[in-house]
């Protein structure tokens, strides 16, 4: 169920980011319409070596959850996730040349009413095809009404 999915996503991201250095940067801007409960996400990707990529979004809200014993652990709840979260989509994937930018990724997240902008964020990560497997190449996060520019892992 959802808890398993959440754990799987976290573990996947953590293990893969350690193993493979990023080849791309991700730029995101978002706008939140609280009356319709819709978040529009525009994402762009710039690649240092080129390749086949796909962009995935996850809408999360932060919160404290009790975890065994009495200490609280920082956690987040996945509110929405695109269908391609562990393998590339057929229609969304794209190939980009080295040092080029792909700017056509726009996502619409609906049913996002009553979100607190202070604790809600959109996580966007890039999947890259490596040896017939899909690896998480880079990940960034942005508030639900904001923007984040390219950050490179040097």
Regions found by a protein language model. Name each.
Residues 1-154:
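Short, conserved sequence motifs used for protein processing/export or organelle targeting and
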């Amino acid at each position: 169920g959802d808890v398993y999915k959440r754990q799987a996503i976290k573990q996947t991201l953590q293990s893969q980011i350690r193993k493979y250095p990023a080849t791309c940067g991700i730029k995101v801007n978002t706008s939140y319409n609280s009356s319709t409960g819709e978040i529009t996400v525009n994402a762009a990707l710039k690649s240092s070596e080129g390749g086949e990529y796909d962009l995935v979004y996850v809408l999360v809200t932060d919160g404290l959850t009790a975890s065994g014993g009495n200490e609280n652990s920082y956690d987040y709840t996945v509110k929405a996730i695109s269908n391609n979260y562990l393998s590339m989509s057929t229609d969304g994937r794209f190939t980009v040349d080295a040092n080029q930018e792909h700017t056509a990724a726009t996502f619409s997240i609906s049913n996002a009413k009553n979100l607190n902008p202070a604790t809600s964020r959109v996580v966007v990560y890039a999947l890259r095809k490596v040896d017939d497997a899909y690896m998480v190449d880079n990940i960034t996060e942005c508030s639900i009404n904001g923007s984040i520019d390219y950050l490179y892992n040097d």
